């Protein structure tokens, strides 16, 4: 069956494709109005460039192939964030703040969930060159605006900080392999296996690691964290950052999840996840990743977010736009002038082709151009 697509790969048919494109234009225009400049990275690069500074998860999600010109291993991008970091660090080479945005397909070897596509249409925004919380606040507010424009207002924005995990893992003496296991258990909030893994860790770090999965909810979480986490300068700084963010974003539905560590391999500070539209999974993910550019010769403070445009477009309401107008074929100058005028006003006008016996309603036409008393007029098109 030559028409069958691989699992978790889908076509976008006209109705869905129209939603995706309308939403893409709307969101990129919003980025532009905030000063974010569009970049278009290539679909594939040398593998070491695509996965530099990333964790094992990104490497496993990346399709690999051999470049027939150089013989080097290439990868099809699974995430555009490292590509944009490369552009900022190596190509633009700006000294001040740089605001960049992007939209393009990425490809995953495996779906992230049972129902997820393996070809998300990734859209995102990144802010480089400012280490202060003002940059994080700008990015989170931009994300909230994007979700509002997509007609899926954020019902919850969870904030976390990977610095908490890094400090506790270091103080627990976790080697890289065990740290990965600890990360997985915290993400899954698997308390029985977490108890077993940290059984030999000294106090107070052991109790702190066991407390992390329960540190989620409202502002009271930060007060609780100050009590049950060690009195460490880096931990205090991370909690202070989260407190200041919560105060600055008081008009948004902000909550906290201190065990949410997605992307911790390259994130370096505040992380966040946005939920909405009744989805149990996060619709957008983001955070600070100050060290990613180091692999490209220029480490810069950076923060940003990304989302799957397809996932948002599914939730976009039908706008009830008028259908197309059917125009008869022919060389009538008045007709051609009217067709051009209608198209300039945003109307869709299809020209009838000789011998076509299909349904014009099926093709999207609900009106037609009819000549009445020497003048062309737009009238309702009756179904065939």
From Swiss-Prot:
Principal location class: cytoplasm
InterPro entries, alphabetized: aa-tRNA-synth_II/BPL/LPL (IPR045864), HisRS-like_core (IPR041715), HisZ (IPR004517)
Pfam family, one: tRNA-synt_His
Pathway(s) served: Amino-acid biosynthesis; L-histidine biosynthesis; L-histidine from 5-phospho-alpha-D-ribose 1-diphosphate: step 1/9
CDD domains according to UniProt: HisRS-like_core
Source superkingdom: Bacteria
Localisation: Cytoplasm
Known role: Required for the first step of histidine biosynthesis. May allow the feedback regulation of ATP phosphoribosyltransferase activity by histidine.
Leftover remarks: This function is generally fulfilled by the C-terminal part of HisG, which is missing in some bacteria such as this one.
Family according to the record: Belongs to the class-II aminoacyl-tRNA synthetase family. HisZ subfamily.
Quaternary context: Heteromultimer composed of HisG and HisZ subunits.
Protein name: ATP phosphoribosyltransferase regulatory subunit
């Amino acid at each position: 069956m030559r028409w069958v697509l691989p699992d978790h790969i889908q076509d976008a048919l006209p109705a869905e494709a129209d939603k995706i494109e309308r939403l893409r234009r709307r969101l990129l225009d919003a980025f532009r109005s905030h000063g974010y400049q569009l970049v278009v990275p290539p679909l594939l690069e040398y593998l070491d460039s695509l996965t530099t500074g990333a964790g094992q998860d990104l490497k496993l999600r990346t399709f690999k192939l051999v470049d027939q010109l150089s013989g080097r291993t290439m990868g099809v991008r699974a995430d555009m964030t490292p590509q944009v970091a490369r552009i900022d660090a190596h190509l633009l080479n700006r000294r001040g703040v740089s605001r960049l945005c992007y939209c393009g397909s990425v490809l995953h070897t495996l779906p992230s969930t049972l129902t997820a596509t393996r070809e998300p249409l990734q859209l995102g925004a990144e802010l480089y060159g400012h280490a202060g919380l003002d940059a994080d606040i700008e990015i989170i507010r931009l994300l909230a605006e994007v979700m509002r424009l997509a007609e899926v207002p954020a019902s919850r924005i969870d904030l976390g900080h990977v610095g908490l995990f890094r400090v506790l893992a270091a103080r627990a003496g976790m080697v890289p392999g065990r740290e990965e296991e600890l990360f997985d258990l915290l993400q899954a909030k698997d308390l029985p296996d977490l108890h077993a893994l940290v059984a030999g860790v000294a106090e107070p770090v052991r109790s702190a690691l066991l407390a992390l999965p329960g540190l989620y909810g409202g502002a009271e979480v930060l007060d609780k964290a100050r009590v049950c986490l060690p009195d460490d300068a880096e931990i205090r700084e991370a909690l202070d950052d989260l407190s200041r963010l919560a105060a600055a974003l008081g008009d948004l539905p902000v909550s906290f999840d201190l065990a949410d560590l997605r992307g911790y391999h390259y994130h370096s500070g505040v992380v966040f996840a946005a939920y909405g539209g009744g989805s149990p999974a996060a619709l957008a993910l983001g955070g600070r990743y100050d060290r990613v550019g180091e692999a490209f010769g220029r480490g810069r403070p950076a923060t940003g977010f990304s989302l799957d445009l397809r996932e948002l477009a599914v939730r976009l309401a039908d706008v009830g736009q008028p259908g197309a107008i059917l125009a008869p074929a022919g060389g009538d100058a008045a007709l051609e002038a009217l067709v051009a005028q209608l198209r300039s006003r945003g109307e869709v006008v299809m020209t009838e082709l000789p011998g076509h016996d299909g349904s014009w309603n099926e093709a999207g036409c609900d009106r037609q151009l009819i000549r009445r008393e020497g003048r062309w007029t737009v009238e309702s098109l009756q179904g065939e």
